[in-house]
Amino acid sequence: MVPVLLYACGSHAEAQTGYTWDQIKAKFETDNPTLKADQSNVDEMKAEEITAYLRPNPQFTLSQDGTQIAPHNNVWQPLRGTYVVPTISYLHEREHKRELRLESAQEGTRIGQAQHQDLDRNMLFGLRTAFVATLQARVVLDLAKADLDYYDKIIDISRNRLRAGDLAQIDVDRIELLRVQYEVEIQSAIVNLRTAKIQLLQLLDDNKTPVEQFDVTGRFDFTGTLRPLDDFRQIALNARPDLQAALQTIQQSETNHKLAISNGSTDPTISGWYTYNSSNNNPNGLDTLGASVNIPLRIFDRNQGEKQRTQIDIARSQQASEAARAQVFSDVDTAYTLVDSNIALLKPYKDKYNDQALRVRDTVTYAWQHGGASLMDFLNAQSDYRQVQLAYVQLIGAYLTSAAQLNMAVGQEVIQ
């Protein structure tokens, strides 16, 4: 009975053209403002790569000299000896400073992209949990409606037995009074479904779609097989974005250390200028050229502190990556245990308990209708069947949630 209801739930959702998980996921990643803001941060880091690779601008200097400011030997010709010197200078960066700056910026962008993917990974877990809760609420509502339909048939049979003198009025009254429990369950299921839809719409940042027009559809079942734990561990080592960010941080730290060493080297400034009517020892040197090389003497400042800091940062990044690796294994192991435990609980329900509860309910109902069982036995059988149904649905919901947790721990969808 339960598998039929689960399938009917999926068919009902499809008739309402509900959103599938892939559609919900795509809509979330497209519209979520938190993800969009974080992606803008990655785009900013990408733009900083341009700045990091820029060459130093050449410098232009225009200087004037040789203007007489006071008479000499009663001669004052202030502008006769004036000359103007246009100068071009350029700082030449040595030891691949520019290339190392670009490499560090590119590695920073890759770290930012990995962190963005990690944010997406964590937020998708919350979205998937809300999606599963909505599916579960829909299944519970369908089960409650099916139980009420079945119980209404029992009430009709009881009234026929009353008219035939085969059942007392007090027993019929007790049966009809218990119908209120089914009505309460339906109303509670309706409220839970609506609440789950509202929470899912909130995560989607959708305040325009009416709740009544929003629905989801998907497979609400479990898979009885699970790959070995080592397979999931290996996938996580390759796919977890936070671990990839930690490993890329090591690379950036090493690049920054190379850059610190490079920044400790000397960068000469090369200058050249032209002079007309210059004051020099050559009386015929009206048009002259000059050049200079300015070399800082790195006697005291050789960037020692930054070299030491970046060396320490390499060790820190390596330790952080080991901690991230340990966290990955812990997350995968914990989630794997939850999934495996839920599968172990679900298998006997699917193989035995569901059919057994249905068989007991139908057998006791038949016996009660023919005087072979008491009213209390009949009502207990109805209650036991509903409890088994609900427990099975709740276990499937727990399985799907733990599967989402395993997907998050691994870093990609390994269980649909």
Region spans (language model):
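Amphipathic alpha-helical coiled-coil segments
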Residues: A37-A52, L119-A144, K153, N160, ...
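Bacterial N-terminal signal peptides
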Residues: M1-A8
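Boundary at the C-terminal end of the N-terminal hydrophobic targeting segment
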Residues: A8, A13-A15
